Amino acid sequence: FNTVAYDKKGKVLNGLPVDFSFTGKSFDKSNSASGLILKDGRFVGDVAGKYIVSAKIGNITSSKAVNIFQRNVKREVTTVGTGLVNDKHTSDFWVFEGVDKKDYAVTGTWGADGTSYFWDVTNPSNIKKIDSVQVDARTVNDVKVSADGKICIISREGASNRKNGIIIIDVSNPYDVKIISEYTKNLTGGVHNLFIYENHVYALSNSERYYIINIEDPKNPYEVGMFEIGKEGQSIHDVWIEDGIAYSSNWRDGVYLVDVGNGIVGGSPEKPVAFGNYTYDSGANHAAFPFKSKSTGKFYAVMGDEIFPNGVNANGLNETAGFLHFVDFTDLNNPKEVARYELPGHGSHNYWIEDEILYVAMYSGGVRIVDISGDLLGDLYKQGREIGYILPSSPNGYIANATMVWGAQLYNCLLYTSDAADDLRG
């Protein structure tokens, strides 16, 4: 809402302080109206109803009535196919197009025996386990595949020889994958997450910093750069790269935007340069995903929490907490947190954004699909933006009949998920 003030002669008065407020009444008599209005007059209603928005300057008030209706974005969500892992926890995954133009996936495992599985998902209603690789590790937390579908990188934690590092795998034939090489320099403390971008691997080292490794020749990888925030007690959980910008999630130190080839501040893989940062009070920044809104032109970093209030039960159900923070980075020098997606009773984990739709793994809350088009403001869950959800589980899972969704990825118009309790799904 915009206000214009005039004097008695009809001249516009600029710069006067305006106080905005609202009242409302829900269309649903069993509910109460709620919403949010900012100092600049932007208003959002959480609940369908009739609202009155008022602007006050001194003792003069002007009001306008507005009706808020439901977005009506609901869709049916159904499972097409399942690839079951029932003897260990499934961790992260990646779906990719192979060199033969068919569709494949790779999944890691957590707290187990260092196994990664490869799947044919060309027919998503008949997901087939086609090969596996076992390495010296307890956990293969992260797996990624190069854009050309030829190289897979898996992370290692808990290796018996304490070297950990990454394993480089030839997946040109996903039915017969071959280990090409390993790389352990500066990564012996364990690699929790990694990312592949333009012939480089960005690998976390002991959850403190990330090293940048050239894999142009996958038989002879070599280090070219490193990034750390340079603070005492620094910690990093994840890194994601898009358009030459790395988004590192650093727990209490929030997200860092780092030029690793975009050119915005002259950065490169050999010389990464940070140019943006945002922190928030919980100190639980676990993941970050960039989002450029097509409908508004605004640029966001969507930052996710990971919180286990009672610790982690490795072999049972877990209570989770936390939510997604939508931070407007349109002005890189003045980022502002403007919205949240919080599912009551469940915490966030990994997520994917495409075409103004958010696909978020909420652990025991399943996978939630959320409309994030238009101006984002306030509590997106309360505003009825949820398109649909699914609560995957299996009576034959590693944890029977449990839901603990780890991640989500949209691929070829299908949503794929991994669940720590049992499987890969599409």
Regions found by a protein language model. Give the residues of each.
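Short stretches within intrinsically disordered, low-complexity N-terminal or propeptide regions
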Residues: 7, 57, 303, 422-423
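Extracytoplasmic soluble-region selector
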Residues: 1-72
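Intrinsic-disorder/low-complexity peptide segments enriched for small residues
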Residues: 11-14, 34-36, 378, 385, ...
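Single conserved hydrophobic/aromatic residue that forms the stacking wall/gate
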Residues: 416, 420-426
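Feature marking well-ordered beta-strand scaffolds used for ligand recognition
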Residues: 48-50, 63-418
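Short linear sequence elements within intrinsically disordered, low-complexity coil regions
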Residues: 25-27, 32, 176, 200, ...
